[in-house]
Amino acid sequence: LQNISPPPSPPLATPTIPYTVGLLLSKLTGRSLPYSAAVLAVALKYVSWARNRGRTPLRGSVLTSLHNIVFSGQTLLRARDTSLLSTLLGDALGLALLWRALCAAHAILQVRFMSLKEIADAAGETGFSVISAIPMMRAKVEKEFAKEESKMEAMLKKPGREITTVIPENGMEDEAIVTSMRTLAGKENTKWQEGKVSGCVYHGEAEHLAVLNAAYNLYAVSNPLHPDVWPSVMKYEAEVVAMTASLLNGGDEGVCGCISSGGTESIVLAVKTHREWARRTKGIVDPEIIVASTAHAAFDKACEILCVRLIKIESDPITFKLDPRKVKRRLSANTILIVGSAPNYPQGTIDPIEDLAKIAQRHGCGMHVDCCLGGFVLPFARELGYDLGGNFDFGVAGVTSMSCDTHKYGYAHKGTSVVLYRSKSLRHHQYFTYPQWTGGLYCTPTIAGSKAGGLIAATWASMMRLGHSGYRDAVRKIMAVATTIKATIAEEIHGIHLLGDPKAMVVAFGVDPRPRPINVYTISDLMAKKGWSLNALQRPASVHICVTYIHTAEGVVENFIADLTECVDAACAAADDPNAEPSKDGNAPVYGMAESLPPGPLNESAFL
């Protein structure tokens, strides 16, 4: 830098392009500056020159201050021309502040759309990050997180288990391998086989699993990446997609899609497809999608991976649905996708898909329905006469894509989901192609290259084995159990209440307001001691059970209601006891901490 001489400085009123560019390069040599900031800085220079050329000077204005910091040799601390070396730091600081202001401009403009809770969360996240940067405070925070981490490890890592960290020199005997695995699996299968797990295992009957395992074994070595070797796997995938599309009112509409590894990949693919569609057809390079706060976290992951701005709208605190009026206010020229859930994972409520699709259609953007949880439940519930609050699938004009998990209520093996699109032209944007590769033409429809053909074959076998009537009968039983649980919580169990108006198989409950409040996570912990594994939720603090086919077995729902009633009564009694100490084990302290902190810091510090 000492050998760099800036170009001579002409009068401010008569700048030249070589002078401007030369001075900018000399002052920023060796540094990297975002292109847009550099362009804006040059624009400031010429706007300032134009304004001063013949009329009103900009003395004292923000524009002049920025211009002086960036170009004229003045710094934040002195108002006279100095050498390059003495102004380099000041000028870099000025440009950095300018760039940070530009980066924050969008967030600042969005504040007017945010609720007080969202503003408080954002402020809390920023404050927590600043405080955590202080060494003394950072040490205290890390100490507390270390305590919780050790508790989680103790809960998940059972003592006495042999841990293998290197490949054994000599292989084990076949029987020894199977015996060892059978021992561990036997200990872990008991809980879900008794129907005491929320979600997780959706069918589980031995006869059904036997057929799926047989189908998988036949295609255990197959790979859909090589359709010339295993053309039957390609056939199975096409038929699974077609049957799923038909179930969701897309059979005669040209709806198409593919099989992915799960709901998260289906969602990532849908976002990626709409991003590419918007970029190629509408020229959008800074895309945004609009989701509810109850939308699955896979949309957060998709936006982080794909560099898409996520506009998250707080769901209605009573209905837990996405408000279409709020969506309208958040639309912009960069909106590429609106997302609705049918149902959402936390409270099991269904967003107003028809209203959201109309907004998307008028705005010219995509509309994705996340039906990962309800894809093989809602169509049959509708057929059975249950009120779902409106249509939710490709029967709604404006819906451009859907995600539907076959490994949930499609009762297939874990690792399969279906992503569907309104047309082949839209699906085309999902594909990745690279014809210039030296290894030959490379084209993959999903994120993965190689996929397990055995899983696709097992999915096809599941759908063919159950048939339409089999799925309908399963949904009839599931909806009956869910309805019983909802009615019992609403009418008979005092101390808790339903969240929203769940229309399908997810039932969430929170605690009633009372002089001495109950911790809902204490109820969850008490249920865990009785062998139940429920899902703890937050914002608001609540718990849900996702009813599956296993819960329809004789006596399961009766046991659940009896245990839940007993645990709620015990939690109320503990809350009313002034001498009772709060629990230090289980989910209660962990989620209590989560509720008191903004979302970002906990995610970044506790779980990474």
Which residues fall in each region the model found?
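Non-catalytic terminal extensions of PLP-dependent enzymes
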Residues: 2-234, 238-242, 246, 472, ...
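Active-site nucleophile and cofactor-binding loops and adjacent substrate-binding regions
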Residues: 229-233, 257-264, 291-293, 500, ...
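Conserved beta-loop-alpha segment that forms the PLP phosphate-binding cup at the N-terminus of a helix
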Residues: 237, 241-242, 254-284, 297-302
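PLP-dependent aminotransferase-like
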Residues: 278-333
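Active-site phosphate-binding strand-loop segment of PLP-dependent enzymes
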Residues: 320-369
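Active-site pre-lysine segment of PLP-dependent enzymes
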Residues: 324-328, 350-362, 374-401
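Active-site C-terminal subdomain of aminotransferase-like
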Residues: 380-516, 597-600
